[in-house]
Amino acid sequence: MIDALDGQPAFLEFTYVTNPGAAWSLFSDYPEALTLLASFALISIFLFRKQLELERHVLQIVFGLIGGGIAGNLGDRLFREPDEVVDFIDVYLPLINYDYPIFNIADSAIFIGAIVYLIIGFTDPKTKPNP
């Protein structure tokens, strides 16, 4: 990942790789289990949408990001051989000289949705117990 202009690593590149595992290739020996887990997660979000308070607009966005990311990676697993997702976003962090693991847009959606959900959980007065 070297920029042709100045010989320095580029901040962002697109690199095609496939990944049978989850984030950072975790559980790459169990792609079928990840497919089942993703299916279960999508079905659970749909079945428990009332309990998840999905009538609230911000939570619709959050679970839209999470569900869309899960669906995107699940689509790759179901329709690509052999049960792998395509990752292509390659980010280099020059300040700490770190080449972040390659990921995709679905991974980003899941991550952003989960972070926003945690922030809501810690800051939303509806989630705080009544004294």
Which stretches of residues belong to each language-model region?
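Alpha-helical transmembrane bundles and membrane-interface segments of multipass inner-membrane proteins
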Residues: 1-131
